[in-house]
A protein has these predicted regions:
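Conserved ATP-binding/catalytic motifs of P-loop helicase motor domains
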Residues: 1-211
Length: 211
C-alpha cells in the first residue's frame, strides 16, 4: 500500500451552495465543530415541507415512512416480486424483494438510461400505470412517460487466479458472475436515506437524523 504512493487531493471549491455564511457553517459541520449546531437550529423549521423529500439515517426509517405514505393513497397496491438466479445473498440485493406500488406513488429510478439519457439512477417521478410485468412512470424532470420492466442486476464475485505471461507468473484478480437479481428498478421515494441522497440537489429537504 505504501509503495503505491497515492497523492492526496483536497477539494476546496464549493459548487452547490452560494451563501458564504451557509458554506462556513457547513465546513464547521464537516470537521466536527459543534459550534455550527446553533446556526442550523435557528435556520430550520419544525413543520415538514409538504413537497420536500424526507432524508433519514436508516433504511428502516425510510421504509416505514414510505409505507405510511403509500397507505394513504386510495388505490389498491400492486406487488412486484423479485426473481433470483444463482447465488444471491441478502447483502447483494439492490432493492426490495417485494415492491408495493400504487398509481400516483412517488418513486425513484434505480438505473441509468444509457441510450436516450432520459433518466439517471436517482431520478424521481410518479407512478402513472401499473401492469403485470412493468410500471410506467412520469418523470419529474422532463414529464416524459417511461415504462420500466424487470431489470437484471448481475451479482459478481472477485476471483484470484494465477496468470503467466512471458515466463512471468503473477496473481490476477477478475470478476465472475455468480447470480442475478431481477426486479422493477424503482423504489418508493417519499423518504430515502442520506446515503442514497449523496450527489443530489433538492429544492426542499425534510431531515430526520435519528433512527
Amino acid at each position: 500500500w505504501q509503495d503505491l504512493n497515492f497523492q492526496t487531493v483536497e477539494l476546496k471549491q464549493v459548487i452547490r451552495q452560494k451563501n458564504p455564511e451557509f458554506i462556513h457553517e457547513l465546513n464547521k459541520a464537516r470537521i466536527g465543530d459543534y459550534s455550527c449546531v446553533h446556526y442550523f437550529n435557528t435556520h430550520c423549521q419544525k413543520t415538514l415541507f409538504e413537497n420536500g423529500i424526507i432524508l433519514t439515517a436508516t433504511n428502516r426509517k425510510a421504509e416505514q415512512i414510505n409505507h405510511d405514505r403509500l397507505s394513504k393513497i386510495p388505490y389498491k397496491a400492486k406487488v412486484y416480486h423479485s426473481r433470483i438466479v444463482g447465488d444471491v445473498k441478502n447483502s447483494d440485493k439492490p432493492t426490495l424483494d417485494e415492491l408495493h406500488l400504487k398509481i400516483g406513488a412517488r418513486v425513484m429510478v434505480l438505473m441509468n438510461d444509457t441510450e436516450q439519457n432520459l433518466y439517471q439512477n436517482g431520478s424521481f417521478g410518479k407512478v402513472y400505470k401499473l401492469e403485470d410485468e412493468s410500471v410506467t412512470v412520469i418523470l419529474d424532470t422532463n414529464k416524459t412517460l417511461v415504462t420500466f420492466g424487470y431489470h437484471e442486476w448481475a451479482i459478481e464475485n472477485y476471483v484470484l487466479s494465477k496468470r503467466k505471461e512471458e515466463d512471468i507468473e503473477d496473481n490476477h484478480l477478475s470478476k465472475e458472475k455468480v447470480g442475478a437479481f431481477y426486479q422493477i428498478p424503482l423504489k418508493l421515494a417519499y423518504a430515502i436515506t442520506m446515503h442514497k441522497s449523496q450527489g443530489q440537489t433538492y429544492d426542499q429537504v425534510n431531515l430526520i437524523p435519528y433512527s
